[in-house]
Amino acid sequence: MLFKEAQAFIENMYKECHYETQIINKRLHDIELEIKETGTYTHTEEELIYGAKMAWRNSNRCIGRLFWDSLNVIDARDVTDEASFLSSITYHITQATNEGKLKPYITIYAPKDGPKIFNNQLIRYAGYDNCGDPAEKEVTRLANHLGWKGKGTNFDVLPLIYQLPNESVKFYEYPTSLIKEVPIEHNHYPKLRKLNLKWYAVPIISNMDLKIGGIVYPTAPFNGWYMVTEIGVRNFIDDYRYNLLEKVADAFEFDTLKNNSFNKDRALVELNYAVYHSFKKEGVSIVDHLTAAKQFELFERNEAQQGRQVTGKWSWLAPPLSPTLTSNYHHGYDNTVKDPNFFYKKKESNANQCPFHH
């Protein structure tokens, strides 16, 4: 089974990279021998880099795949000690942030006996009973159990929670200067500033498995950049997240939120305008949802020219604001999952769950 997955990946990648059949067959022969001897095989650095890029290209839920080939891949498979691990994490955050001109990065640790990360994203805000991000309550409880104490605000940056092989779970509090944040304001509605809203610049996903040719990398944090609606519609407005619709509408001085007033819709539009222009004011990369959809159209055309079918999950590719203005709303997608790819960890796995409460 493993060899078949390896074979499919190697043949696909090597052909895309224009390798001759003789070289492909030699590599497959070596992999087959390695699997027979050890039960697994090791990717070359080139395979790791290209495989990670292919995983982004194959990510059905991602609207930003046009830039898959620009992914910066850090091979951290040799990282085993704490100092090197923490250094690699801060390096990733620094390079990805790039003083606001965000760059897509992935740091890939060893498939076995590597470090574990318990955070959903490398940077996220704590969730308390009465404030903060409800989506992060479990991670916040774990951080508290380990001895971390937040300030109890809506936007306390959670520490990195990690575990090295044969060691206990620990937390690392980021230096304030490492985390770039954007205060949210609206140039036409100054009252919005009184809500003290802000959001971090770089979304670095750290709770997914990277699978390349049958090899699973359970710790491989990766980032692109935000599409505005991820913050302005989902994070701030969803009732199971910050649930700020009423407060935002009040800041915009909308006197009613009756459905037939359309003020709920207006509040969403104005908040997304505020998020987008706040990021731009701070010099931080972000894309609006309509531009992102246009970029995805270009990605589809590029893939068609290469003879590759684009797979996708429609409910994720249609943005949550004015989706009918985008072309991807108006046709379906084949949701077949290709390899390489990113996968959510199985619920029975405790790889990124609280080791004290699972």
From Swiss-Prot:
Its cofactor is heme; (6S)-5,6,7,8-tetrahydrofolate. Gene3D superfamilies: Nitric Oxide Synthase, Chain A, domain 1, Nitric Oxide Synthase, Chain A, domain 3, Nitric Oxide Synthase,Heme Domain,Chain A domain 2. CDD domains: NOS_oxygenase_prok. Keywords: Heme, Iron, Metal-binding, Oxidoreductase. InterPro entries: Nitric_oxide_synthase_Oase-su, NOS, NOS_dom_1, NOS_dom_2, NOS_dom_3, NOS_N, NOS_N_sf. Heme binds at C62. Its EC number is 1.14.14.47. The keyword Heme applies. It holds the Pfam family NO_synthase. It catalyses: 3 reduced [flavodoxin] + 2 L-arginine + 4 O2 = 3 oxidized [flavodoxin] + 2 L-citrulline + 2 nitric oxide + 4 H2O + 5 H(+). One of its GO terms (molecular function) is heme binding. One of its GO terms (biological process) is nitric oxide biosynthetic process. SUPFAM superfamilies: Nitric oxide (NO) synthase oxygenase domain. Catalyzes the production of nitric oxide. This protein is similar to the oxygenase domain of eukaryotic nitric oxide synthases but lacks the reductase domain which, in eukaryotes, is responsible for transfer of electrons to the ferric heme during nitric oxide synthesis. Belongs to the NOS family. Bacterial NOS oxygenase subfamily. Homodimer. This is Nitric oxide synthase oxygenase. It comes from Staphylococcus aureus.
